[in-house]
Every structure is written in structure tokens, then in C-alpha cells.
Amino acid sequence: MSTTRSKGLHALQRWRSFGEDRAALARQLALRAVAEATAAVAVVQDRAQAAREQRLGLLQSPLLDLTRLTASAGMEEAAWRDVQVCQQRLQHAEDDALVAREQHETAHRMARAVAHRATRVVAIERDAAEKHVFDSLVELRGRPRGGPHD
């Protein structure tokens, strides 16, 4: 085995490690986006629930003001549309997080495969070098002493 092969594998190993680090960062960012989207859904749902309670309060009041009731119903409807939008964003963020997780796992497997291969190649090269040294010593000891040397 040549050291060129192990150097190439080490370069590939560094590249795959870099890819794994990038995939891990993308996964962390995707998880952060999911957490932020979840928090946004909770906030918007609280607002929509407050708008619903306000509208119900207006309906239960002894004096019914249609203008305020219509405005309150419009605000509640807009709030529930915002909830739907935030839930869609959350779903997209969860889908992106799933894709990021799969990409990170793939990058991790690829990096490990190259690392194992590089370890095997280095061991093979080390064994070949030891065998070469041993063969050289055997050859040197096998030459007759005092005779002509090449």
C-alpha cells in the first residue's frame, strides 16, 4: 500500500467530518426553528383564545353593541387565521428538522465508514512497512561475510 492512499483517505476523512459538522449545525438550527415555531403557535393561540373570550363577553353583556361585536368577531377570525399560518410554519419546520436529521445521520455514517477504512489502510501500510524492514534484515543477514558486496 502506498502512503498516497492513506493520505487520500485522510483528506476524504477530513472532508466527511466537515460535512458531518455542517449537517449537525443544520440539524441544530432546524431544531431551534421547531422550538421557535412551537412557541409562536402557543402565543398566537393564546391571542386567538383571548379574542374568543372577548367576543363571548360582548355576547353576554346586557347591551348588545353590533359594531363592537362585529369588530371583535373579525379580530377573532384573523387571530385563528394566524394560528393556522403558524401551525403550517411549525409543520414545515418539523419537516425540515426531519430532513436535517436524516442528512446528519447519513453524513455521520459516511464519516465513520471513511474513518474505519482509513484505520484499516494505515494498519495495512504499517504491517507492510514492518514486513519490508524484516525482509531487508533477513536479506542483509543472509549475505556472506567478507564476500563481494553489490
Where in the sequence are the language-model features?
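Charge-rich amphipathic alpha-helical interaction elements
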Residues: 1-150
